[in-house]
Curated annotation (Swiss-Prot):
The lineage of its organism: Bacteria, Thermotogati, Deinococcota, Deinococci, Thermales. One of its GO terms (molecular function) is GTP binding. Keywords: Cytoplasm, Elongation factor, GTP-binding, Hydrolase, Magnesium, Metal-binding, Nucleotide-binding, Phosphoprotein, Protein biosynthesis. This is Elongation factor Tu-B. Coiled coil: none annotated. Residues 82-85 are annotated as: G3. The modification Phosphothreonine is found at residue 395. Mg(2+) binds at residue 26. Residues 137-140 are annotated as: G4. InterPro entries: EF-Tu_GTP-bd, EF-Tu_GTPase, EFTu-like_2, EFTU_2, G_TR_CS, P-loop_NTPase, Small_GTP-bd, T_Tr_GTP-bd_dom. Residues 10-215 form the tr-type G domain. The keyword Transport does not apply. Belongs to the TRAFAC class translation factor GTPase superfamily. Classic translation factor GTPase family. EF-Tu/EF-1A subfamily. Its main location: cytoplasm.
Length: 406
């Protein structure tokens, strides 16, 4: 019988390493692949060098270096993202290029929490990473067990400061390097055969147990951003787009949300894909949705079709933003309060006015900043929604809605 027939049945979870430079994120990422590969032939090992030279990818007009690895435990299949540079982390988390269901915070026991440790925890809070598990690395370099307790306490305090449950978060102590060196010596090392390898398994157990399996997109309330609208003579108005979440079928009541002064309700009279009728459209499908009693003028690109009551239009919000550097194709100069770029949400640009927080005079290219935006038209918004900031069609920043104001 073929090995690896079970792959599809395991729940899938997205994770990633975060933490200060040189605390061992990439070494740990490599160790996770080696350790799980010893027990599972489906896992491909990735060594430090493979992960460190991460390929460039583009998300919302921004170039980001990101390494993706995959591994599995008996319970789950994981996609894991690791970024080589600090700026890459900021860009990655703000654009949501690699969404994380949970993060592994790596802290060197020899150094304790450092500036980027704090910055990454803050970012995780702002962009809505729901769970953090801590790996206290390099414990072989610290002789005094009391020092380890102290570092653990500092990390827990820091997590509490940013509204993570610091007292409940699992903290695993180990050495990614010693585990990786053991796996290099004997790639078949199993759980129970080496204390450092066992620490990696302890981390995997914590990830399995502590980070819940996310609700699949298809089980969330229906939402489809409208990309295009046309009329089918004799049948009515069709809105096309890719279903972002949930499902839709004939007879469902939906709301048309955003851009218009009023949200209006209508009923789905048909769902089509490549000109063929569908029983039901689900998350990820590109479909045309036929709407009852809606004229061609009453629905437009940039609106969303959604399950009634699941999302509302707003004009004012707070956002966490990364401003592109000049070398990344961004602005050459800073900007002030009153700056009026376009904000690109899902399928459309809407002009908005930026209000910087008290004490911040100016924002420079390369900055990571939080500010308030007031849009000239209402858009279907929710916390965690990503957007691009554009000027004359080019991307100058990326952001995520952290709080809806009105």
């Amino acid at each position: 019988m073929a090995k690896g027939e079970f792959i599809r049945t395991k729940p899938h979870v997205n994770v990633g390493t975060i933490g200060h430079v040189d605390h061992g994120k990439t070494t740990l990422t490599a160790a996770l692949t080696f350790v799980t590969a010893a027990e599972n032939p489906n896992v491909e090992v990735k060594d430090y060098g493979d992960i460190d030279k991460a390929p460039e990818e583009r998300a919302r007009g921004i170039t980001i270096n990101t390494a993706h690895v995959e591994y599995e435990t008996a319970k789950r299949h994981y996609s894991h993202v690791d970024c080589p540079g600090h700026a890459d982390y900021i860009k990655n988390m703000i654009t949501g290029a690699a969404q994380m269901d949970g993060a592994i915070l790596v802290v060197s026991a020899a150094d304790g929490p450092m500036p980027q440790t704090r910055e990454h925890i803050l970012l995780a809070r702002q962009v809505g990473v729901p769970y953090i598990v801590v790996f206290m690395n390099k414990v072989d370099m610290v002789d005094d067990p009391e020092l380890l307790d102290l570092v653990e306490m500092e990390v827990r305090d820091l997590l509490n400061q940013y509204e993570f449950p610091g007292d409940e978060v699992p903290v695993i102590r180990g050495s990614a390097l010693l585990a990786l060196e053991q796996m290099h010596r004997n790639p078949k090392t199993r759980r129970g055969e080496n204390e450092w390898v066992d620490k990696i398994w302890e981390l995997l157990d914590a990830i399995d147990e502590y980070i819940p399996t996310p609700v699949r997109d298809v089980d969330k309330p229906f939402l489809m951003p409208v990309e295009d609208v046309f009329t089918i003579t004799g049948r009515g108005t069709v809105a096309t787009g890719r279903i972002e979440r949930g499902k839709v079928k004939v007879g469902d009541e939906v709301e048309i949300v955003g851009l218009a002064p009023e949200t209006r309700k209508t009923v789905v009279t048909g769902v089509e894909m490549h000109r063929k009728t569908l029983q039901e459209g689900i998350a990820g499908d590109n479909v045309g949705v036929l709407l009852r009693g809606v004229s061609r003028e009453e629905v437009e690109r940039g609106q969303v079709l959604a399950k009634p009551g699941s999302i509302t239009p707003h004009t004012k919000f707070e956002a966490s933003v990364y401003v592109l550097k000049k070398e990344e194709g961004g602005r050459h100069t800073g900007f002030f309060s009153g700056y009026r770029p376009q904000f690109y949400f899902r399928t459309t640009d809407v002009t908005g006015v930026v209000q910087l927080p008290p004490g911040v005079e100016m924002v420079m290219p390369g900055d990571n900043v939080t500010f308030t935006v007031e849009l000239i038209k209402p858009v279907a918004l929710e916390e965690g929604l990503r957007f691009a900031i554009r000027e004359g069609g080019r991307t100058v920043g990326a952001g995520v809605v952290t709080k809806i104001l009105e």
